[in-house]
């Protein structure tokens, strides 16, 4: 009986731990560039984005749930784009090519601090 009570207590603790809300982890520039690395051939030269590129772009969009995350992602992308020789026209067309709907403007002149 003592073993059964201990087992139930442990099981209850495991269930409670799984039900706890885990704090969200803020997005980093490594997350942004890592998710978009498969897109570099498209972002530099055009053509058609690969399935891996679109999957990374969708993953990045899913990771930017908060205003702070969206602004961080914007700032990271703006910093990295010139260094990686990303064409602005290709960057702005990527969401549409991947079937992604976003209200975030994608252009080199966007003020990241105004993104909702």
From Swiss-Prot:
Residues 1-26 form the signal peptide. InterPro entries: Bifun_inhib/LTP/seed_sf, Bifunc_inhib/LTP/seed_store, Plant_nsLTP. In germinating seeds, detected in the entire surface of the cotyledons, shoot meristem, inter-cotyledon space, primary xylem and immature vascular elements (at protein level). Expressed in seeds, but not the aerial parts of the plant. The keyword Oxidoreductase does not apply. GO terms for cellular component: extracellular region; membrane. GO terms for biological process: defense response to fungus; killing of cells of another organism; lipid transport. PANTHER family: NON-SPECIFIC LIPID-TRANSFER PROTEIN 2-RELATED. Belongs to the plant LTP family. This is Non-specific lipid-transfer protein AP10.
């Amino acid at each position: 009986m003592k073993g059964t009570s201990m087992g139930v207590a442990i099981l209850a603790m495991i269930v409670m731990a799984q039900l706890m809300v885990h704090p969200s982890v803020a997005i980093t520039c490594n997350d942004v560039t890592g998710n978009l690395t498969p897109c570099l051939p498209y972002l530099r030269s055009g053509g058609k984005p690969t399935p891996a590129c679109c999957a990374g772009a969708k993953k990045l969009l899913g990771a930017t749930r908060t205003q702070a995350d969206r602004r961080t992602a914007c700032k990271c992308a703006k910093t990295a784009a010139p260094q990686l020789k990303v064409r602005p026209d290709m960057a702005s067309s990527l969401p549409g090519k991947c079937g992604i709907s976003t209200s975030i403007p994608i252009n080199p002149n966007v003020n990241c601090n105004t993104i909702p």
